């Protein structure tokens, strides 16, 4: 009997099938714009009104993350360019969060968007030293096949350049440097 790989199931399966293999699988996106409200909007993998898989989550959430990004007028040849370095950095950050999650971990993945920042949190520890990740050149994805699937649609490069690029883009924007934290019980980044 044929069946998908774990990466195929996570990327393209339905949530009700995914949780049979990954019991704690849960993807959660929250917009928190009002301090008096738990969330202004929320998308969760278990809602039942969409597939709940990683691939569909990526595109639903990426489109939410970029809504407030300014796009200055720029032409390349005769075509308008709407893709900025900030867009590229957000794609990289979101893909990194998804492909480096430990889907067997005890807690789900959470993306939190507030007026003044974005927090991305996934189950699992950081697989390389943080200083090495910031310096670049080291790629050790937890879910390499998922990363390859993203690479096939031009998201990510598997060159270990994503985190340094995110820091560079934030610096060029004059924003505070991103922060990384690692919690060990339960493992969370």
Predicted stretch roles:
Residues 1-116, 151, 155-161, 171-186:
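Bergerat-fold GHKL/Histidine-kinase-like ATPase
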Residues 118-154:
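Glycine-rich/acidic phosphate-handling loop/turn and adjacent ATP-lid/helix
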Residues 119, 188-189:
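Core structural elements
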Residues 162, 166:
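Short alpha-helical Gxxx[C/S/T] motif in the catalytic ATP-binding
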């Amino acid at each position: 009997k044929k069946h998908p790989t774990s990466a195929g199931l996570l990327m393209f399966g339905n949530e009700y099938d995914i949780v049979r293999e990954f019991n704690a699988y849960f993807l959660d996106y929250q917009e928190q714009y009002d301090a008096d409200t738990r969330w202004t909007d929320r998308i969760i993998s278990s809602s039942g009104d969409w597939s709940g898989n990683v691939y569909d989550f990526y595109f639903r959430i990426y489109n939410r993350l970029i809504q407030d990004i300014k796009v200055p007028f720029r032409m390349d040849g005769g075509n308008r360019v709407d893709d900025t370095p900030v867009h590229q950095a957000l794609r990289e950050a979101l893909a990194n969060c998804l492909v480096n999650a430990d889907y067997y971990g005890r807690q789900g993945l959470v993306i939190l968007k507030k007026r003044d920042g974005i927090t991305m949190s996934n189950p699992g520890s950081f697989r390389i030293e943080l200083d090495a990740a910031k310096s670049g050149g080291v790629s050790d994805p937890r879910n390499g096949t998922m990363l390859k699937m993203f690479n096939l649609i031009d998201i990510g490069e598997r060159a270990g350049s994503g985190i340094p690029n995110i820091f560079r883009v934030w610096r060029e924007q004059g924003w505070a440097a991103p922060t990384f934290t690692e919690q060990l019980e339960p493992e969370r980044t």
